[in-house]
Amino acid sequence: MAVCIAVIAKENYPLYIRSTPTESELKFHYMVHTSLDVVDEKISAMGKALVDQRELYLGLLYPTEDYKVYGYVTNSKVKFVMVVDSSNTALRDNEIRSMFRKLHNSYTDVMCNPFYNPGDRIQSRAFDTMVTSMMIQVC
């Protein structure tokens, strides 16, 4: 089950973070923040290959005892980070990839909104509803 979904700007500040157990919210914020170092490492290691292959999915960034952290980066260097419960062994890599594609499509809809200023926090009800449904769907 996805317990935290975050959208991080190109400059590494959060545009949107949603986590389900609210008592562990600070822990998830920390995990998302620390995963940005791994994202930057993977992007710099891939370099031109990332641009040439158009592979946006970064895969597993790092596992912890209770959670696994996955990453995805857009062409505009906006990063999506998803924290998944490690106990859910039925969740496959292609399912995570498809969740990131859904998230990317929804983020694109937010960006196309003429009333949204790029770089501001995402406060779209449609985006929030989609993230909530993704977190429930994976359970």
UniProtKB/Swiss-Prot annotation:
GO terms for cellular component: cytoplasm; cytosol; endoplasmic reticulum; perinuclear region of cytoplasm; TRAPPII protein complex; TRAPPIII protein complex. It comes from the Eukaryota. Pfam families: Sedlin_N (PF04628). Keywords: Cytoplasm, Endoplasmic reticulum, ER-Golgi transport, Golgi apparatus, Transport. GO terms for biological process: COPII vesicle coating; endoplasmic reticulum to Golgi vesicle-mediated transport; vesicle coating; vesicle tethering. It is found in: Cytoplasm, Perinuclear region; Endoplasmic reticulum; Golgi apparatus. May play a role in vesicular transport from endoplasmic reticulum to Golgi. Component of the multisubunit TRAPP (transport protein particle) complex, which includes at least TRAPPC2, TRAPPC2L, TRAPPC3, TRAPPC3L, TRAPPC4, TRAPPC5, TRAPPC8, TRAPPC9, TRAPPC10, TRAPPC11 and TRAPPC12. Interacts with the heterodimer TRAPPC3-TRAPPC6A. Belongs to the TRAPP small subunits family. Sedlin subfamily. This is Trafficking protein particle complex subunit 2-like protein. It comes from Mus musculus (Mouse).
